[in-house]
């Protein structure tokens, strides 16, 4: 690194040292002093003007002391200026390095934004489209679910009605079974009564046969007795010859009338009993036939009700199975849609976090750039203040009536650069407010110079 070099050039006319413009290369940058824009008379630091020295009254000892003091002051100022230049060069080098990094990061950020802006927009658009599609499907599923719930309620009502009918039919069946049991009992009673009547008929027939036999035996006995009486009468007639024929004839007629009457009474009693038993048997047979017919009708009704109950049970089981399958299907689809929504929300949250991170990095870079710009402006103001403070005196020869000095100003190649202050406010990864403010360095320098004047 080269330092600033002051060359003393003595003019042939005035014999005074003139400081030529100084340039130095600091960290790859050139800092050159501009052409002096004004001349400053060398006077004492007090506000009173310096006395003019004539050639005849020059005190060379005092001039030499003044020159030594001046050169000592200048050497100290040169050392301080050299140190300041070294520090400024290091700061400039650091600023240049940071600006290179800043420009590189800004370029990378721009490339990243160019690369990911479209993709982020497409991802957001795809996410929004998919979310709309999922919401539409959820609405359709909600409508289907409501419809299925209505159908389920209707089926539940139908099942309740069928259960009610089933209970009623089961009650009727139980009543029919009870009636059938009673009818079976009546049939058994009728069968027992019929058997009892048949036994009675048999006993009566046996009794009739016995009575017939007894009647026949009595008739035979009567006939035998009549014959014996006739024989006796004949014997008596033959012996006494009384008129017994009429008496026998009367006795025979009486016995015949008694036998005929007994026969008729027995036949009438038998016929009446037989008719009663026949009517009772017919009534029992009719009741048994009706009981069998009612039993068959009830059996057919029970079979039909059992078939209806079985079909209703199968229909109910099929509907319940279909309802469970649909509920499982809807639950699985809802879980899938919920997983998809969660995944999309995670992706959106990750994208927002990544965007927030990039915005924070960009804001940090802007803050670093602003701090560096402020630091550079501060050093520039310090240098300008140092330049304004330093007054370069020019020694006059004894023939000169006064001292004149030139003041050189350093000019920076970056004096015309503008400072861009960009403020970005973010909230939850989204840009809320963004503002940009431009400020020229020349304006700052001019305002500072006007304040000095």
From Swiss-Prot:
Residues 71-112 are annotated as: Coil 1A. Keywords: Coiled coil, Intermediate filament. Residues 424-453 have a biased composition (Basic and acidic residues). Residues 392-453 are annotated as: Tail. One of its GO terms (cellular component) is axon. GO terms for biological process: intermediate filament organization. The keyword Transcription regulation does not apply. Residues 77-390 form the IF rod domain. Residues 113-126 are annotated as: Linker 1. InterPro entries: IF_conserved, IF_rod_dom, Intermed_filament_DNA-bd, Intermediate_filament, Keratin_I. Signal peptide: none annotated. Residues 223-245 are annotated as: Linker 12. SUPFAM superfamilies: Intermediate filament protein, coiled coil region. Residues 421-453 are annotated as: Disordered. This is Plasticin. Residues 246-391 are annotated as: Coil 2. PROSITE patterns: IF_ROD_1, IF_ROD_2. Residues 1-51 are annotated as: Head. Optic nerve. Belongs to the intermediate filament family. Residues 127-222 are annotated as: Coil 1B.
């Amino acid at each position: 690194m080269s330092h600033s070099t002051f060359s003393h050039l003595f003019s042939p006319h005035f014999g005074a040292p003139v400081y030529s413009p100084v340039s130095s290369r600091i960290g790859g940058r050139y800092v050159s002093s501009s052409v002096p824009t004004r001349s400053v008379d060398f006077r004492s630091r007090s506000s009173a003007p310096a006395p003019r020295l004539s050639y005849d009254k020059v005190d060379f000892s005092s001039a030499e002391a003044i020159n030594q003091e001046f050169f000592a002051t200048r050497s100290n100022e040169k050392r301080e200026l050299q140190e300041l230049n070294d520090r400024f060069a290091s700061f400039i080098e650091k600023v240049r390095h940071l600006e290179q990094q800043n420009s590189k990061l800004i370029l990378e950020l721009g490339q990243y934004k160019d690369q990911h802006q479209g993709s982020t927009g497409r991802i957001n658009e795809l996410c929004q489209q998919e979310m709309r599609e999922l919401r539409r499907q959820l609405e359709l599923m909600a409508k289907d679910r409501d419809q299925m719930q209505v159908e389920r309620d209707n089926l539940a009502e139908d099942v309740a009605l069928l259960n009610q009918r089933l209970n009623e039919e089961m009650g009727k069946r139980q009543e029919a079974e009870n009636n059938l049991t009673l009818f079976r009992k009546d049939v058994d009673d009728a069968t027992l009564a019929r058997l009892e009547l048949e036994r009675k008929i048999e006993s009566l027939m046996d009794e009739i046969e016995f009575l017939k036999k007894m009647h026949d035996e009595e008739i035979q006995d009567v006939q035998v007795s009549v014959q014996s009486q006739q024989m006796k009468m004949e014997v008596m007639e033959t012996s006494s010859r009384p008129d017994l024929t009429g008496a026998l004839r009367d006795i025979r007629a009486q016995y015949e009338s008694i036998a005929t009457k007994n026969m008729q009474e027995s036949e009438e009693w038998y016929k009446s009993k037989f008719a009663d038993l026949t009517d009772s048997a017919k009534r029992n047979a009719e009741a048994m036939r009706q009981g069998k017919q009612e039993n068959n009708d009830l059996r057919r009704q029970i079979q039909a009700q059992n078939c209806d109950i079985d079909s209703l049970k199968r229909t109910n089981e099929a509907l319940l199975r279909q309802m469970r399958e649909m509920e499982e299907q809807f639950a699985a689809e809802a879980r899938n849609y919920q997983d998809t929504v969660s995944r999309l929300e995670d992706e959106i949250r990750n994208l927002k976090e990544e965007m927030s991170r990039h915005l924070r990095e960009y804001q940090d870079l802007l803050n670093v750039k602003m701090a560096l710009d402020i630091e550079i402006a501060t050093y520039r103001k310090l240098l300008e203040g140092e330049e304004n403070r330093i007054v370069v005196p020019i020694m006059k020869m004894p023939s000169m009536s006064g001292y004149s000095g030139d003041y050189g100003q350093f000019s920076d190649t970056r004096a015309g650069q503008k400072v861009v202050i960009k403020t970005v406010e973010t909230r939850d990864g989204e840009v809320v407010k963004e503002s940009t403010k431009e400020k020229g360095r020349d304006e700052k320098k001019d305002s500072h110079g006007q304040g000095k004047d």
